[in-house]
């Protein structure tokens, strides 16, 4: 999600260390200690303005959530939502999520969410897609055995590519939704993009893939 630079974004992030972890590499292997409990940890790579991560945290108080985004302005808007919601089970990371092993130990994360990731439609940019093999390698490392990746997109090309990528990697497709909002799936928490696209009648695709 690209947004204009927000004046004061850096200062806002730095002023809220209770939610924004500025040196996440130091927390590697210690995230439950940082949260102050032994609850499972779920992360969202590319958390945007925070609608999904705050909604999930509010609905599931016994799960810890970490939202990751490289854009400080976007993350500052997510922080606004966190502060307004006042949920204790969220941390935000202002980092590049290309190698999550820099921040999380093996098996430290229970579940990973990819919501409306950049489709990078050109073939020469395939390696930048978050469901490309090299990303799956890092996801598998920080997730436990049978760890899950939950993926949503409005881009059919990326969806089909991801189904193939997951399958070729040897992952089990636990669930596939070709039109999420027309299905009987319960508990869906919308992202900002999802709210925008679905209101225009855009089909939303979803898959739950499990490492074997």
Swiss-Prot record:
Domain of life: Bacteria
Pathway: tRNA modification; N(7)-methylguanine-tRNA biosynthesis
Active-site residues annotated for this sequence: 118
GO cellular component, one term: tRNA methyltransferase complex
Chain positions recorded as substrate binding sites: 122, 154, 191-194
Alphabetical list of InterPro entries matching this protein: SAM-dependent_MTases_sf, tRNA_(Gua-N-7)_MeTrfase_Trmb, tRNA_methyltr_TrmB_bact
Reactions accelerated catalytically: guanosine(46) in tRNA + S-adenosyl-L-methionine = N(7)-methylguanosine(46) in tRNA + S-adenosyl-L-homocysteine
Region (Interaction with RNA): 124-129
Residues annotated to bind S-adenosyl-L-methionine: 44, 69, 96, 118
GO molecular function terms listed in the Swiss-Prot or TrEMBL record: tRNA (guanine(46)-N7)-methyltransferase activity
EC number: 2.1.1.33
Signal peptide (from-to): none
Keywords recorded for this protein, A-Z: Methyltransferase, S-adenosyl-L-methionine, Transferase, tRNA processing
Protein task: Catalyzes the formation of N(7)-methylguanine at position 46 (m7G46) in tRNA.
Family: Belongs to the class I-like SAM-binding methyltransferase superfamily. TrmB family.
HAMAP family in alphabetical order: tRNA_methyltr_TrmB
Record-linked NCBIfam families: PRK00121.2-2 (NF001080), tRNA (guanosine(46)-N7)-methyltransferase TrmB (TIGR00091)
Protein's name according to its UniProt entry: tRNA (guanine-N(7)-)-methyltransferase
